[in-house]
Curated annotation (Swiss-Prot):
Annotated substrate binding sites: G41, G42, R63, N156
Family: Belongs to the acetylglutamate kinase family. ArgB subfamily.
Record protein name field: Acetylglutamate kinase
Family annotation (InterPro entries): AceGlu_kinase-like_sf, AcgluKinase_fam, ArgB, Asp/Glu/Uridylate_kinase, Glu/AcGlu_kinase
Species of the source: Bacillus subtilis (strain 168)
C-alpha cells in the first residue's frame, strides 16, 4: 500500500523553498509516496489588504475576517499563492492541481465565533475523496485553506488546522510542518524525536521560545488517533536524504528499547 504525507507550508516560507525541497518531493514520489500540500498565505494577504487600503484587525492571534477581508483572502489563497506553488512544482517536473477546501466538498465548517473572528470557520467534516483521486493519479493536490458551510457560505480556516484535518481524513503516515529551521534545537543540536510531555518541558525551560512555540503547538494539536507522527522540517534545505527524513519527529510516545 502506498504511503501518504501531508505537508503544511506557511505563507512566509512558500517563496523561499529550496531546490533541495523540490528535489526531495521528486524523490518521495519516485519512492512511491503519495503527497498532498496545504498552504497558508498570511503575509501576502496582509500586503494585498494594505494595497487595497482595507483595514484589518487581529483577535487572539487570528485575523478578524470581515467580508471584504474574506474576498481578498480567497483571491490571494486560491489565486496568486496557490497557482505560484503549482507552477513551481511543475517547473520541477511534479504534476500538481491547485484546489481549495471548497472544491469537492473537501472541508465543511461552521462559524467559529462570528462576533470575534468574523468569517472564520471551524472544520466539522472532511471529504477527502477528491484529494485521494488526484493522488491516485500521480497528481499532488495543493490545497488553499478555505471551506464552506453546509449552506455553501465561504469561510476562511486556519491552515494548520486544515492540514491536520486533511491528514486525519487521509490517515496519513506523516504530517510535516515545513518551516525555515531544521527542527527543534537545543544547544545548537537538533532534537530528533520528542513527545508532547518533553515539548512542554522544553517550553518551560525556554529552550523552545518565540516563533517556534506556535509551530510546535500546531504540531502537538495535529497528533491524533489518525495522525501518529508529525514532523517539523526545513523547507530551505534538504529534509530527505538516503531514504531518511531529517527534522524533529513528534510522537505520542517513544518506542520502548528492548
Amino acid at each position: 500500500m502506498k504511503k501518504t504525507i501531508v505537508f503544511k507550508c506557511g505563507g512566509s516560507v512558500i517563496r523561499e523553498l529550496s531546490e533541495e525541497f523540490y528535489q526531495n518531493l521528486k524523490e518521495l514520489r519516485a519512492s512511491g509516496w503519495k503527497l498532498a500540500i496545504v498552504h497558508g498565505g498570511g503575509p501576502e494577504i496582509t500586503n494585498m489588504l494594505k494595497r487595497l487600503n482595507i483595514k484589518t484587525e487581529f483577535s487572539g492571534g487570528q485575523r478578524k475576517t470581515t467580508k471584504p477581508v474574506l474576498e481578498v483572502a480567497e483571491m490571494v489563497l486560491s489565486g496568486s499563492v496557490n497557482k505560484f506553488f503549482v507552477a513551481e512544482l511543475a517547473k520541477h517536473g511534479l504534476r500538481a492541481a491547485g484546489i481549495s477546501g471548497k472544491d469537492g466538498g473537501l472541508l465543511e465548517a461552521d462559524y467559529l465565533d462570528p462576533e470575534t473572528y468574523g468569517e472564520v470557520g471551524e472544520i466539522k467534516k472532511v471529504d477527502a475523496s477528491m484529494v485521494n483521486a488526484l493522488m491516485e493519479n500521480g497528481i499532488i493536490p495543493v490545497i488553499a485553506p478555505l471551506s464552506m458551510t453546509s449552506d455553501c457560505k465561504t469561510l476562511n480556516v486556519n491552515a494548520d488546522l486544515a492540514a491536520s484535518a486533511v491528514a486525519g481524513a487521509l490517515e496519513a503516515d506523516k504530517l510535516m510542518f515545513v518551516t525555515d529551521v531544521d527542527g527543534i534545537m537545543k544547544e545548537k543540536q537538533r532534537l530528533d524525536v520528542l513527545t508532547p510531555k518533553e515539548i512542554q518541558m522544553l517550553i518551560k525551560q525556554e529552550v523552545i521560545t518565540g516563533g517556534m512555540i506556535p509551530k510546535v503547538n500546531s504540531a502537538l494539536s495535529a497528533l491524533s488517533d489518525q495522525v501518529s507522527e508529525v514532523m517539523i522540517v526545513n523547507g530551505k534545505g534538504s529534509f530527505f536524504a538516503e531514504q531518511t527524513f531529517q527534522g524533529t519527529k513528534i510522537v505520542k510516545a517513544k518506542e520502548a528499547v528492548s
